Amino acid sequence: MKYMISFAGKSKPSSEEEIITKKYLRRLSNIIINQCEVKTKNIELRLKEEGSKLLKLTPSNGKLILLDEQGTNFSSNELAEIVSDWENSNFSTINFVIGGAYGNGKEIKEKADKTLALGRLTWPHQMVKMMVAEQIYRIDTILKGHPYHK
């Protein structure tokens, strides 16, 4: 299984969160980070453009998990089970998508295969990328029976 973390907005590569994210990325050879940036000031148009760009990053034989505060709170084991089911159904890629500063537009919410919340709190992009990278690593270790997840 290949993994992607795709996000809308700018990245601050020197932040502590980015350093930790890279630590998990080094442990996984099958992960790609994608960034898309939309500069329009109109919020409605921005949500639509960001959603469209982020949707295009998910391959046709892939699945999209949208990070959204109104999503479902899955446990790590539940996420690992979802990933395992998709892998057994011959889906090759899972794209974890993080919306922009104004959240996610209607189109991407409707097209997401799963919507995941990291609790009810709002988190900065850098921290969400770090948490998603860690969860991907955790899922990978759960599926391989590695003792990282206890």
Q: Whereabouts are the PLM-identified features?
A:
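Short glycine-/acidic-enriched loop or helix-start segments at secondary-structure transitions
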Residues: 15-17, 75-77, 105-108, 127
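Structured adenosyl-cofactor binding patch, chiefly the S-adenosyl-L-methionine
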Residues: 107-150
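N-terminal beta1-alpha1 ligand-phosphate binding loop
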Residues: 1-25
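Proline/glycine-rich low-complexity loops and linkers
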Residues: 99-100, 111
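Short, surface-exposed alpha-helical segments at coil->helix boundaries
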Residues: 18-22, 51-52, 106
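S-adenosyl-L-methionine/SAH cofactor-binding core of RNA-modifying enzymes
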Residues: 30-93
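Loop/turn-to-beta-strand initiation segments
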Residues: 2, 91-97
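Short glycine-rich anion-binding loops that position phosphate/pyrophosphate groups of nucleotides
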Residues: 10, 69-72, 100-103
